[in-house]
Amino acid sequence: GTEESLSALKPGELPQGIEVQVLDHGYAKRYEEQTGKKPDWFTCHGDVFPTGKSTMTPFPPVAPRGSRSFPSKELSKPSPEWNHYYVRAINGEVRLWVNGEEVSGGTACNPATGFLCLESEGSPVEFRNLKVRLLP
């Protein structure tokens, strides 16, 4: 998100930004158990999508709702194994590599600049060997 989108955020709203989603395989399994159907709006392998009022043109394959870039391959490993995510965001384009292979992303991202945010939605999460580099 941007500084403006974070400071004006109301409770329950999502900040503006582009999300690179990291979900454990158990999330999809739990969804299937609760709904009786396979998820068609998310994967556990590296979706990239806009949040809040942000916009992005997703790379294919695209989720049925049209704004989410689904990964071209299912390369993430289940817990407790570690995954390597490489995210590159330059000039309004975001690209994601999972365990060494490019799988998803998008272009024409708005906002095109902002903060890097790490978050968890109600479950513990661990990161290791995190490296951040400012790119042009």
Predicted regions and their residues:
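Carbohydrate-interacting regions of secretory-pathway proteins
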Residues: G1-P136
